[in-house]
Amino acid sequence: MCILALQFQVARDAPVLLAYNREEDAERPSSPPRIQSGRPRVVCGVDRKANGTWLGVNQHGLCVAVSNRPKRAVPPEPISRGLLCRKLLGAANARDAARMAVDELSSGNYAGANYVCVDASYAAVVYGGDSIR
């Protein structure tokens, strides 16, 4: 289980304070955070099994994090939740990323997940379990 703590617009000089602990299979290979190729520029670690990420920030100040959640109806071959996290990091802001998350999760192609999309002016949690909200 992953643990995420977020303070949004609490500290005057830091509108987003985020702490995240990834609790994943210790044998699952991953790369440490680094600047990824492409635009916008993104800093994130990479899950080398599925090429996704669990947490990242882009050059616009958008931060996206994913955590697993239960879902009764999981597709037989779900798309990697970490790949969706990387896709959301392509957005210009948190509002757009949250809309993209709702659209993607509504496809039914993912196992259960929560997505936190936050920047200096907007924060959202998209719950992608048996219903999307």
Question: Where are the language model's segments positioned?
Answer:
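N-terminal nucleophile
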Residues: 1-133
